[in-house]
Amino acid sequence: MKKYLLGIGLILALIACKQNVSSLDEKNSVSVDLPGEMNVLVSKEKNKDGKYDLIATVDKLELKGTSDKNNGSGVLEGVKADKSKVKLTISDDLGQTTLEVFKEDGKTLVSKKVTSKDKSSTEEKFNEKGEVSEKIITRADGTRLEYTEIKSDGSGKAKEVLKSYVLEGTLTAEKTTLVVKEGTVTLSKNISKSGEVSVELNDTDSSAATKKTAAWNSGTSTLTITVNSKKTKDLVFTKENTITVQQYDSNGTKLEGSAVEITKLDEIKNALK
């Protein structure tokens, strides 16, 4: 009888260990905040395999995993009702999370989102061939670049969503080009793959007296517009992802007044007139 009871006790203990990852609560776990407004529950004690159990809920789906560390880092997985598989990878320093959704085979990506501690993120959606078809890059300040209809050659549509207005353009394998047109003038903001910004201006006006030209200073991120050999205004594309405009005096020799932040798309167009 004693051996029987010991056997039952051992079985119950093993079951408890196996179910440990499914029964984490505030008493036996610690909640750790993660980038992307998520959190993970980490068991206070190691399981039978000498690892810490992890549980996180993402879009109402419970993900489970284990880790050698008790700080919340590790890999968690789950399966949706449609049998697609979800994988959450938490970096060792907790500074980044990677959320991936795969097809039923567990290999073909459907979507992927990488979120950093500073709230910046990169989100990608994939087509049936496993190629990126849509992409959203969100900066720490909340402004973002949105790419849609991405083709296999890397081309597609582009949109930069700033604080209070939107710039639209195109994507190529080399760069993003965002365009604003006003009359004969076209302003192009180019963003390289590495994130470097350059701006250029083209004017099809045939009259030399009114035709606009511009020079870009990469050191100050300033586009200086000139008409009839006189500087008329500076457009500054700041690191804070804003654009300011400041006028030159009538002689075109020095700036006057203060730089004013552009808050509407029409204000950019007015600056191009």
Curated annotation (Swiss-Prot):
It is found in: Cell outer membrane; Cell surface. A lipid is attached at C17 (S-diacylglycerol cysteine). One of its GO terms (cellular component) is cell surface. Keywords: Cell outer membrane, Lipoprotein, Membrane, Palmitate, Plasmid, Signal. A lipid is attached at C17 (N-palmitoyl cysteine). It comes from the Bacteria. It is a lipid-anchor. Pfam families: Lipoprotein_1 (PF00820). SUPFAM superfamilies: Outer surface protein. Residues 1-16 form the signal peptide. Disulfide bonds: none annotated. Belongs to the OspA lipoprotein family. This is Outer surface protein A. It comes from Borreliella burgdorferi (strain ZS7) (Borrelia burgdorferi). The gene is ospA.
